[in-house]
Amino acid sequence: MKSVFICVICVTLFVTARANTVATADLRDEVNTFLGKELAAHLAAIKSLDPPPDRILGVPTTGEYSWGTFMRSLAAYAETTGNRELAGRDLAKTVGQIGLIESRAGSKAFSQLYAALALRHFGRDLKTNALWQSLSPEEQTAWRSLLNPERFYDPKTNRVIDLAENYLGVASRIASIGYELGISNDRAFLDKLLDRAAVQFTEGNLYADDAPPTGRFDRYSNEYARYIWEAAETVGRKDLLDKIRPSLKAQMRLWWDVVSEDGYGYNWGRSQGVVSYLDTPEIVGFLAAHPEFRPAPLADMAALYYQAWNYLLHDYRADAHLLSIFAFGRGNYAYISRDREWQQTTGFFGKLANSHTSIMNALEKEGITTFPVVPTLPSVARFEFFRKTPERSAGVWVVRQGMLRFALPITTGTKPGMSDYQPSPHGLPGFAAPVEQVYPSLTPFIELADGRTVVATDGADMIEPSANGRTLRARWTRWAVVGLPPGKLQDVGLTSEVVWRIEGGALTREETLSSKQPISIRRWRMAIPSTYSNIDMEMLKRGAVRFKSPKGTLDVTFGADFPVQATVVAAG
């Protein structure tokens, strides 16, 4: 028994003219001026740190990592600009006191990493470090406690406690900075942690599974590899650097093939929205300091950094001194809760300040006084395997062919059927899966007679890309089941074979469902979620749909050898 569904997608974009080049010196001044002005506004709003205010500029400061993020931003600004005072405050003393807030609160993970980075921003010798010297002996003890990664890493089990795998990279950086500064002198503890953190890479993997063994691959693999590299580099672990080098080269090439022209990083996974724009300064900053991993000329990467900065600047509400994180139509994963609005905004300051000097210094050192406003991104059509095994394979199809630009991941999500991890063309202009929703976004959900809903996702049983990268074939005989934990795949008697093709400027998805024995399907459903606000209803009657906006159009034609009913639902 077989059933076939075909979907053809076409994209049209309307392009506007832009300036040609950016002056390096002008951008250096522009960013530093912005940071000084906005950090001063936030700092001036704090009347006392004892007790710390629960709101600043009208938004909560109680979200996870909030104070650690802010102190890192102040410290990075101090090192970037050489300024030791801001808004009438001594920055070293202020950062020192904020660290005590995080220490007393028992804060962990990124709060600890940001504390370690903040301390190092004021110097690598504690005898002359202005922050450290501003602390009393009791306060120094509290800071030492704050910089102990055992708050979330258990050396007995060699695992992080109730956190994703990539947090081993966070623990490694905290421990390496602590060792570098003399906060800790336990080299055996450090090396054991580094060896454990790097194990996926030392075993020969190019990409890290963030929830082993389920096969969850996303932007955290890139961050994880960078963090371990920086930790190993800090304490001279050349053996680990040699093992991680192939991964970083592959991951940076993939990032360059995935990233959007406007500076948006990874289009799939749990880092949607502003987080993916904030990735770009960090990655470009790393590449500015580590030329061996650059996938493109520095001038083009600087242009990408400029695009991300330009987006974030225009997204910033100068009257409120906050990013527009919760504006209408914005989607964020649940970890970016309402009480982290301030934290995400000051995180923007910190990531910008920390990366900006590295990028500007590299440009000036290499004699690049101007660079393009828009990066030259290469055409690409290829499949990158994250994992290739007889049991279950995973990877991503990256396409940048004219107006067809997307990343189609075949990987495991945080839940079966999670929209952001489905094998759909994420980043395709006009198409956008709803963030962190179990929803059939160009990936069908099949409801069986027994009530189970199954989805062809969470890796695949077979992945077969064509040699030219313009066709991708995948097969599922074991299905993800909505409501079960990730990785709990089931053979329900159905086989799905999907073929994606790029032909004549269009993307075609053809799916064949088959079974060896009769199977009752209660419902088959698929949605085409779009960011475009208008729709041509007349076309819908003819088995097609056109989404329209001032940015362009998204045309979708569909058909099947079984009856299909189409409806339109608008959010508002």
Question: Over which residues does each language-model region extend?
Answer:
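Extended polysaccharide-engagement surfaces of secreted carbohydrate-active enzymes
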Residues: 261, 265-268, 275-563
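Short, low-complexity, charge-dense intrinsically disordered segments
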Residues: 3-10
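Hydrophobic h-region of N-terminal signal peptides that target proteins for export
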Residues: 10-18, 59, 71
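Aromatic-lined, polymer-binding surfaces characteristic
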Residues: 57-284
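Boundary at the C-terminal end of the N-terminal hydrophobic targeting segment
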Residues: 17-21, 25
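Extracytoplasmic/secreted proteins, especially bacterial periplasmic and envelope-associated proteins
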Residues: 34, 69, 170, 220, ...
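Non-catalytic all-alpha helical scaffold/repeat segments
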Residues: 24, 28, 32-53, 62, ...
